């Protein structure tokens, strides 16, 4: 196998094919990764995938690498990047990343984000060589126990779009892409509000229930509203977990509410274009 490697826009494939390619390219990765077509479509649509900017690299007619690019305004993000084992360690990672960066600059993007699993030393080294700089560490949590939920009427269900719009009015809020308001309201799930000041977004699917975001009005912070809401959610949704998208500085809140931090963590990284 020594054919030329060529790239094509991911728009040539459907979500089910892209899910298979992504799973195939992640073979032997640090953390086991699989995804089906339905989940691929739901997840990356919420993250604002750009199929025309996402790339598949082919060799001898077979997909060998895949980069998922998501975009909002003049900001893009490398949402997933995987290379088949037979092409790893041959310099293709740097070649493919340079192509993605050049294309981002050509379309006028100002910033490019990504996340990398802590412990993926080769991936981290590659991104740092390409100019990406660590911004923060992202962590995840899961509930370790729960008590009987008693309906008191304090926690009310609302339209997720209402919560997203509330977050968008906070000009000082800077969240990871996965927790941003623009992502949250597009996911299947529910939103809740406590005392008209504390909000939570719960994403649901047949496999798990996940707390995707907790938000408290700036004027109500430091008064225990977040802790009360997260405790109520813990009771109502046994086994509740979060995505690995929580800024590390929020860990004390979750740990104090009966959650355990997951072993997998990520660095959020930024390249200014």
How should each PLM-predicted stretch be described?
Residues 56, 62-70, 77-82, 193-215:
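Conserved beta-strand in the GNAT
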Residues 90, 94, 106, 118-136, ...:
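Conserved active-site alpha-helix within GNAT-family acetyltransferase domains
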Residues 30-68, 167-193:
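Active-site rim helix/loop that mediates acceptor-substrate recognition in acyltransferases
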């Amino acid at each position: 196998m020594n054919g030329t490697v060529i790239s094509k826009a991911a728009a040539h494939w459907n979500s089910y094919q892209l899910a298979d390619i992504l799973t195939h390219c992640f073979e032997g990765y640090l953390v086991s990764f699989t995804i089906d077509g339905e989940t691929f479509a739901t997840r990356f649509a919420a993250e604002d995938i750009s199929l025309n900017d996402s790339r598949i690299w082919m060799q001898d007619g077979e997909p060998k690498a895949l980069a998922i690019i998501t975009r909002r305004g003049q900001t893009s993000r490398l949402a997933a990047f995987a290379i088949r084992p037979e092409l790893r360690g041959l310099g293709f990672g740097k070649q493919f990343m340079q192509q993605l960066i050049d294309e981002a600059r050509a379309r006028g993007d100002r910033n490019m984000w990504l996340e990398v699993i802590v412990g993926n030393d080769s991936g981290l080294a590659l991104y740092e060589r390409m100019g990406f700089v660590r911004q923060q560490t992202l962590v995840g949590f899961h509930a370790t126990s729960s008590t009987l939920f008693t309906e008191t009427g304090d926690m009310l269900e609302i339209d997720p779009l209402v919560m997203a719009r509330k977050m968008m009015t906070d000009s000082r809020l800077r969240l990871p892409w996965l927790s941003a308001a623009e992502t949250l309201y597009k996911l299947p799930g529910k939103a809740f509000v406590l005392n008209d000041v504390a909000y939570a977004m719960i994403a649901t699917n047949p496999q798990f229930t996940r707390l995707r975001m907790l938000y408290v009005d700036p004027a109500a912070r430091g008064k225990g509203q977040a802790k009360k809401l997260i405790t109520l959610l813990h009771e109502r949704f046994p086994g509740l977990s979060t995505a690995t998208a929580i800024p590390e500085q929020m860990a004390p809140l979750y740990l104090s509410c009966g959650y355990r931090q997951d072993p997998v963590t990520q660095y959020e990284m930024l390249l200014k274009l």
